Amino acid sequence: SMVLGYWDIRRMLLEFTDTSYEEKRYICGEAPDYDRSQWLDVKFKLDLDFPNLPYLMDGKNKITQSNAILRIRVDIMENQIMDFRQFSLFLGKKLTFVDFLTYDVLDQNRMFEPKCLDEFPNLKAFMCRCFKMPINNK
């Protein structure tokens, strides 16, 4: 099965699509040093062309960087997320890579400022719609 290595945070797309994978979590230490030795001890031993997190290993295929990994799973241009003028277009009948990117960006903003979407009902509605959709298996 696939192996996903990442910091101890998100793995939404694989979970949502019910994809079988082995998980390798790397935990960053606490402030002020933020010890990264869990990752640094194995970083150059994984035979990755560009050793970085996240990484995805699927057989002979070894990929690093979030967007590169997501492109492998779903071939959608990520730059659409930046164009909110077309907001209603990127969430269609099925969730796509762009929807996950959008959700992630909005959710991270809410972590820093929980009320940041209060004046944007369309974005709040998008957040609610995302995970009310049925799971899209492969």
Curated annotation (Swiss-Prot):
Binding-site positions, glutathione: 6-7, 39-43, 52-53, 65-66
Positions of the GST N-terminal domain: 1-71
An annotated GO BP: glutathione metabolic process
Nucleotide-binding as UniProt keyword: no
Broad class of the protein's primary localization: cytoplasm
Coiled-coil regions listed in the entry: none
GO-annotated cellular components: cytoplasm
Catalytic class of the enzyme: transferase
EC number: 2.5.1.18
Top-level taxon of origin: Eukaryota
InterPro entries: Glutathione-S-Trfase_C-like, Glutathione-S-Trfase_C_sf, Glutathione_S-Trfase_N, GST_C, GST_mu, GST_superfamily, Thioredoxin-like_sf
GO molecular function, one term: glutathione transferase activity
Stretches assigned to the GST C-terminal domain: 72-135
Residues bearing the modification Phosphoserine: 1
UniProtKB keywords: Cytoplasm, Phosphoprotein, Transferase
Subcellular localization, as worded in the UniProt entry: Cytoplasm
Catalyses which reaction(s): RX + glutathione = an S-substituted glutathione + a halide anion + H(+)
Annotated function: Conjugation of reduced glutathione to a wide number of exogenous and endogenous hydrophobic electrophiles.
Protein family per UniProt: Belongs to the GST superfamily. Mu family.
Subunit structure as annotated in this protein's UniProt entry: Homodimer.
Protein name as it appears in the record: Glutathione S-transferase Mu 5
Organism the protein comes from: Mesocricetus auratus
Source organism phylogeny: Eukaryota, Metazoa, Chordata, Craniata, Vertebrata
Gene name for this UniProt entry: GSTM5
